[in-house]
């Protein structure tokens, strides 16, 4: 069973991860505004070219930020006064966050920035809802209560929904 150490690790990992992902929230919002403006002007070709540019930019920045998050694990661990076991748990969890930043931020820009700006909000909502309630929550339940897996594996299982969303 996971305890206070796991809760601390998830809190720290989520906060650090958010620092690396904030750039993508800006990219997603910028793409929504720029693409939405072009679609409103009935300039679909320019909106499409913006979408392609934003996706390429997201992919390139995503690689850099994922590697930076992975490499910063040691610095993050040094900030906190955790025991050795918790430090290992934090390092492993940050590694999972770094790996899953790739599909997560790509789908964020794709869904929140590009598809929603084009009016495809129902598809985005359904994919988000199904991802969380059909994939993420059941896998977390199985990982914690049935299989008693380590924290980083449970986090990876929950984030698996991002690969599924990327497929659609």
Regions from the language model: what does each represent?
Residues 1-2, 71, 75, 137-138:
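Short helix-kink/termination motifs in transmembrane helices of multi-pass secondary transporters
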Residues 2-6, 147-150:
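Short extramembrane helix-to-coil loop segments that connect adjacent transmembrane helices in Major
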Residues 3, 83, 120-121:
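Short loop-to-helix capping motifs
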Residues 7-73, 105-124:
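Small-residue-rich hydrophobic transmembrane alpha-helices
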Residues 14, 37, 58, 124, ...:
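Amphipathic, positively biased hydrophobic alpha-helical segments used for protein targeting
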Residues 25-28, 97-117, 123-132, 139, ...:
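Short runs within selected transmembrane alpha-helices of multi-pass transporters and secretion channels
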Residues 35-101, 143-168:
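Short alpha-helical transmembrane segments in multi-pass integral membrane proteins
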């Amino acid at each position: 069973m996971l305890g206070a150490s796991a809760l601390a690790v998830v809190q720290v990992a989520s906060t650090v991860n958010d620092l690396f992902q904030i750039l993508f929230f800006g990219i997603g919002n910028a793409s929504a505004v720029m693409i939405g403006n072009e679609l409103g002007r009935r300039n679909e070709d320019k909106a499409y070219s913006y979408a392609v540019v934003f996706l390429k930019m997201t992919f390139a920045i995503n690689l850099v930020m994922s590697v930076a998050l992975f490499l910063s694990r040691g610095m993050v661990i040094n900030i906190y006064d955790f025991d050795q076991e918790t430090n290992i748990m934090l390092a492993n969890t940050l590694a999972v966050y770094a790996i899953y930043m790739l599909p997560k931020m790509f789908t964020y820009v794709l869904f929140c920035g590009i598809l929603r700006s084009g009016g495809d909000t129902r598809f985005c909502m359904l994919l988000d809802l199904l991802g969380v309630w059909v994939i993420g929550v059941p896998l977390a339940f199985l990982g914690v209560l049935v299989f008693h897996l380590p924290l980083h594996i449970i986090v990876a299982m929950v984030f698996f929904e991002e690969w599924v969303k990327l497929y659609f």
